[in-house]
Amino acid sequence: MTTLTISIIVVFVLGYALIATESLTKVNKAAIALLMLVGCWTLYMVDPMQYLQMMHPDYTGGAAGMVEKVTGIIQEHLGETATTLFFLMGAMTIVEIVDQNGGFNWVRKVMKTKSKRALLWRIAFLTFFLSAILDNLTTSIVMIMILRKLVTDHKDRMIYASLVIIAANSGGAFSPIGDVTTIMLWNKGLITAAGVIAEIFIPSVVSMVIPALILQAMLKGELVMHEVSALQNASVSDFTEGQRKAVFWLGVGGLIFVPIFKSITHLPPFVGILLVLGVLWTATEVFYRSLHRGQDAEGTQKRVTKLLSRVDMSTILFFLGILMAVSCLAEIGVLTALGQGLNVAFDGNHYLVTGIIGVLSSIVDNVPLVAGCMGMYPVAAVGDMAVDGIFWQLLAYCAGVGGSMLIVGSAAGVVVMGLEKITFGWYMKHISWIAFVGYLAGIVSYWLIRTFLYAV
């Protein structure tokens, strides 16, 4: 490993440490993430040829075409990152439109209970199954908006929000369309829909239920009901009950439609999100036009043009910085070398290798880790490396669920961190060990299933 490579890693680790201590430094994590992005790629440009020769052996342009090649590489990574950012912005805007126009009101009535623990279990299972249909990012945004309608105490809401992260990641792990890593494995033909659902469903449930059992001990008594519910109801009286339900189904139903749209058109998911946003935007404009409210300020504030200003841009920029910094680590070969080193260190023990990959996925982006594994290990005709083999199914589980161990370890965690202002330190102190226990319990349950139910 060269001095330059070590320097890039040091910049990443230092930036990560500053993000982890945001509550102490009082420096916004988005600012640090952007500095990580610039720092890593600036160091990369000190001597990019060594990395081009290592990671792109087909490159023959020499020094003359080096800058153009690196520019193309950065643009490729930026394009991949942008699809995530546009998806996130679209999903956040859709949920904001539904929320501000009263679309979640009837959902709140269905979920409403005075018991804190009863609400915890309703939130857990709704998040779990919703995440299997949607992606865990969109599910987290939806559930946080619902929680804000139900829970006024921020300390309690942080506990519920933490469970949303765990349940969203667990729910996405057993579904071929629930998480970007399972989509990658499914599209590559390494797992089948029937196989991953049959064998990963129970471990995923276990990885969610165990933390929920522990977290419910932190919640005692009854919820404080909203004293301003009448005022809140009045604030959404612009739309009729039918219009509010139409907004809900156009928004949430549209989000559910996104994976279907992707499978039909083969276009990236963000295109489907923009389709849903366009349809919902048009519908609300038609509804508001029919109200004839003139220059009513309150009604104007709920129109999409105003709601766009409510999108949390610091979260978007944080995503940009983190994903692009991690892409630099991928380009210098660190992630691939890490995967190969694990395989050698643990002598090919699939449970240990994938288990460690899961832990690592809570530190760095799981997408390049999974991509590295897909590139390192060839598919076998039979055995643990075959389609639906132990390795690939464990990889789907560990890469998905492992991200719950740190709040920045998954897209769900990052967006909840931004929406609910949960600090890295608080999550690590109170939630990380709980998520780790659930993670290990899920792996054990998978071992039991493979050993006793599917043993040949």
Map each language-model feature to its residues:
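Interfacial loop-to-helix junctions that mark the boundaries of transmembrane helices
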Residues: 1-4, 24-27, 55-58, 67-84, ...
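Alpha-helical transmembrane segments
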Residues: 79-89, 195-213, 265-278, 392-402
